[in-house]
Amino acid sequence: MANETNTFSLNRKTQYLAAAVNDNVPYIQASRSYLKDKVEGKKCGLTYNFYFPDPGKAYAGTSEVDITNDLKVVQEREVSCTLMNARTSVELGTWERLTEIESFVNEVAEPRGMTLGTEIEIDSITRGWKVSDGARVVAAADLGMDDLAGIAADLKAIRSRGKFRGFADPSFFHSLGAKNLSLFLPSDIMREIYRSAFIGNYMDVDWVSETYMPTLSVTGTMTSAKVTEIGTDGVSVTGTNLYAGYMFELPNAYCVDMFGRKTKQKKVFIVDSVNGAGTAGKLSQRIVCSTGNAAEATAVQTNCNTFGTFGSICTSGLTATSLITESGDYSIVQARDADALEWDTYKHPSLAGCEESTQRVGKITCQVAKWANIATRQQVMRIDVPYISQMIDGRRSRLLVIKL
């Protein structure tokens, strides 16, 4: 009976931990599970390639009858996802001493859950915002509701069928003023999910206050960058004073919609990483070169997305036009389709000799293992939150870059 009681207590405490983490990850609440059945047996820290179906090409017209030259196989996009893990630990004496739920929640679950959730949130945002196909730059003094309406319109133009979410630092909403904030429409459903972080709906985007949206600090004189390589493993650029988050456009490169059709929006490329000297950068987004269908014969040369169709721009030596041309701090605001973010949890293998519990609440799966170190006679609780967080489609994300 004692073991049964202890097991129940461990499960209950693990559940409260999972709930506390789930309360502190607003960014990943706007996500979709694509890989739940594909990660079983996969190992933390390793990167795996997964494949997502493409809508393919369609043809219409009086001459579009012969399918001889049509592609006979389903197109698939390859996306690399790394299995991540967030962890913390608690000394067993603290864990066992707190037998009342309220005390445990206040002293262990909430503070540890907030810490774990914060790390997951920062990791997801840091990697996620850079997978965006479009951006608008505006000075803080000129910021208005038209700018929010603009990125909402950009998202609608790509004909995405999901629900749009927007994330910005709390100071951004404060800068809009009470009059403009009154234009955001309330939603009981969103309020239940995001609680006090939910601002409201504007132009079909549900806006959420998120403390960890990044601020770019740009220093030094920015010279024109050059594209040195475009391939299936990404894009390489060289320049001066490059930085992670450096945004640029290429000549005649435009965004495409969900069906591969060219839009009027210029395609934006965002650098993931740079060398220590800031002279070389890399975009990890895969790019595939191909020809278009007959209806796109003239437009295919300028069609471009992170995994889609290029024509003539699949060459090196192109001059990159920088979106940010002045030194200073720039606040990043992101609006995206919730389905553009892949989020899944998985389970670590059981540890022999440990008492364990695994519980899921909302988007979070929490694993707790209890064990003793014979050498030190110390007993410890290990808490893990294994996860996959990966933006899989830059077409469905837009940025508002605000010069502070």
Put a short name on every predicted segment.
Residues 2-35, 93-103, 112, 117-135, ...:
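Short, Lys/Arg-rich flexible segments
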Residues 175-291, 401-404:
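Autoprocessing Asn-cyclization modules and mimics
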Residues 279-316:
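Short solvent-exposed strand/turn elements
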Residues 54, 252, 385-389:
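Beta-strand elements of well-folded, non-transmembrane domains
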Residues 58-61, 175-178, 258-259, 390-392:
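Short helix/loop capping segments that flank catalytic or ligand/cofactor-binding pockets
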Residues 50, 77-147, 156-171, 195-197, ...:
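Long, contiguous amphipathic alpha-helices that act as assembly "spine/axial" helices in icosahedral shell
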Residues 1-78, 397:
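N-terminal "assembly arms/tails" that initiate or stabilize quaternary assembly
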Residues 1-29, 42, 185-217, 312-404:
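Protruding loop/beta-arch "assembly-hinge" segments enriched in small, turn-prone residues
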